[in-house]
Amino acid sequence: MSLPYPFSALVGQDEMKRAILIAAVEPAIGGLLVLGDRGTGKSTAVRGLAALLPKMRAVQGCRYHCDPQASGGCDDCLHLKSGVRVRTEELPVPVVDLPLGASEDRVLGALDLERALVDGVKVFEPGLLAKAHRGFLYIDEVNLLEDHLVDLLIDVAASGENLIEREGLSLRHPARFVLIGSGNPEEGELRPQLQDRFGLSVEVRTPSAIADRVEVVRRRDAYERDPSEIGRA
């Protein structure tokens, strides 16, 4: 797996970088919306964030990486409320991409059809919302997201839980994450209901200084040749 472009190697865009760090330090701020021209490093900055985050402590083997010190976890971790000691592990804070073409099953999770057909058991296969729990859910071109997915995100972001009632399944699991969206306003408007879910917003522009543009190309070329080297530069 290739290394993401380093967050610190981005040229300029100080307001965007500061906003991303604020959202990372204080998740209660309510998410971040980054709007601006294409090619301004919006996606690169968000994906580079993962390397800056400290690891988190989670219940070992939990599919939703529940916090062993917090209540309100998944059904499998309800015993934590009784004070029972459990094994834990350190995991990277998840930074999960939600692509525009993602199906509802992929986002919410769905019945594992292979297990159902082969073993005759109903097993829930967690979706992107589960993977993003306690981390970040990133949507590039969020202004182009399909309406039905927007409605789902609004519900989950408000409740902090994902409720599944389909295909004979009825369950809920925690889904608390920092929502980060980016997009170009010229390509489509963002629904007001979703825009209200972002507590912080920032606009970015293509660098106008020739020196900055040259430096962007130089650093990108260095990254393409040796991703690990630019991270140490």
Report each predicted region and the residues it spans:
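Conserved small/polar residues in nucleotide/adenosyl-binding loops
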Residues: 233
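Conserved ASCE/P-loop NTPase catalytic core
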Residues: 1-203, 208
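Short, charged, surface-exposed secondary-structure boundary motifs
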Residues: 174, 212-215
